[in-house]
Amino acid sequence: MAEAESCRHLVLVDAPGGPQVADIVNSLAGLATCTVVSLRWGSPAEHARRVDGLRALGPVDIIERADQVVDALLAVAAGGRPIDGVLAFSEIVSYHAAVAAAALRLPANSPQATIRLRRKDLQRQALSAAGVPCPEFAVVTDEDELEAASSRLAFPVVLKPAIGVGSLCVTRAEDRYQLAEAFARASRQYRDDPRVNGASPVFVVEEVIQGDNWHADERMGTRVSVESLLDADEIHHLAVTDKLPLAPPFREVGDVMPSGLPEQRRAEILDVTTRALRALGATSGATHTELMLTSDGPVIIEVNGRIGGGVFELLRTAAAYDMARQQARIALGERLEELPLFSGYAAFVTPQPPSGDYEILSVGGREEIAAVPGVVEVIQTKSAGAVLAKEAGTNAHTFRVLAAGREPDEFFTQLKAIEDSIQLELGPAPSRGAQEPHRV
């Protein structure tokens, strides 16, 4: 390690989500000396294992809530060791880490850009004002605002939290009665979910965007995402990622990188993404922009100020590209070192169970999935006894699977083999008991 690098001090703000702990440790090796601020999460045993892995980077300070991040980082700085950069990968803590970095005058987005990247209501307002394509919307905090939105917007609509995570509480409503029911249910669910860190239940209601399939293969979805890194106000788009159709109601099933769309179509997508990032004032770090493909061109669904789920693994597998290390370099005030060069494709798959409220009676298939040709990694995320709620969003998946290949045509063969390998038996959720037993 060079002396200049060893003298730099990077603080990693950690929580579940983003790259695995072992990958984070490998990505940051030799870049700087590290202090870790880790949010207590999961069971005591799970968090202890996570902290044990993170200790390979340096000392680990534990916090109980995400809103303690700023105080924790100021305490580290007050301890006499200057901080040269702040880094976070998890959407649970990325906002608070960005606020702390700005407070310490370190490389980061402005406070205005940071809050726009977090809150969909402020984001929609900024995009609309700049003329960036996005759906018609209304901000809703109570029944009166909900009634006004119902009168102004054209149904069907989508209800989503202004501050969301993993498709939590995202619901489609065909009429004002469904919307009222969804709002009441989502408000309760949102308050109870620990991932939102006590955020107030502010919602955005927006008109459904009619997607148009730009792909030669109709099995691919009408949404894409763009993965970007920003340094010193320069935007570097790393990849366009294709997405499978969502599982009901709005749950992610799989992503494929790089996109198989023609170059001209990709250029349209990147142009709208650049306009969105400029409208939001983003200048630093990682962004994950989701877009709907329509007959009139790409439309922004949302922009997130973080690495997208599975994106680190996709870039590593398809291009041998370490996005986490590049993001850390930017956090330390350096310029982007390189852009990815793809040698094949990679797929990140999260097969979804049936929509509803269930308890998992049994789950299996890990070894069978691992044996599918091209599968690189399998992580089982749920065990028998876990309860699945229909409002939980993408987090309902029981496995995360990373696969790779040379020709994109291989992907759907892999996908079918993965889905056929999952053995899942579901029973009624203990608290509701409304669903019939279900075997997948």
Predicted regions and their residues:
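Peripheral (often C-terminal) accessory segments that flank ATP-dependent C-N-forming ligase machineries
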Residues: 11, 129, 328-440
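A short glycine-rich, hydrophobically flanked beta-strand micro-motif that places a catalytic Asp/Glu
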Residues: 283-295, 435-436
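A conserved helix-loop-beta module that forms one wall/lid of the active-site cleft
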Residues: 103-169, 193, 202
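Short beta-strand-to-turn element immediately C-terminal to the catalytic PLP-Schiff-base lysine
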Residues: 140, 170-175, 229-231
